[in-house]
Amino acid sequence: PPTQTEKPSTDKDTSIDEKPSIEQKPNIEQKPSVDEKPSEEIKPSPENNSNLGEVNDKFMTQVENLIYEKVNEERTKAGLETLSYNTTMEKYARIKSQDMGDNNYFSHEDLSGNLITTQMKNDGVTYRAWGENIAYIGGVSDANALAEQFMTNWMNSQGHRENILSSKFSSIGVGVYKIGNKVYATQEF
């Protein structure tokens, strides 16, 4: 699959896809509902092992929030309107990240050759334009460092940067999934 791998040090593994997905649907009404996403700062710690699943979920939500904030920082720097947070797109971003992690692949197409838009359409989700950025990072466990590395990688890749800074999109959902020492991130526009 088309991937670009950067290894800033021997203990980190990062990868972004070379060709972000963009699909236009000019005759479809609007994007799914939009909700604001609250900010939360929680990191996993050894004393919380009894609730590790819950702590991990909160940690990943923190990374999602930070990525969302960084997307809007980049859009503001570029003189663009900020994106609203879309919980419907968040659902599909989380599904995509978890599917890649659980099934050990890295591609816009799942193991059956389908984009996430196939599942969206099956669920009755409509949109005017759609875009997706995917990436994974290994060996990083700090929420801020993860969000920063994902955004740096995406902003240093022309197609991903174009998705983040596109005027075609008005909302975004972010999904992050951790399995082993890898963290997968998906942006659905």
Model-derived features: where do they sit?
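Conserved alpha-helical segments that form or flank metal/cofactor-binding pockets of metalloenzymes
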Residues: 94-123
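N-terminal targeting leaders of exported, membrane, and organelle-targeted proteins
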Residues: 1-105, 167-189
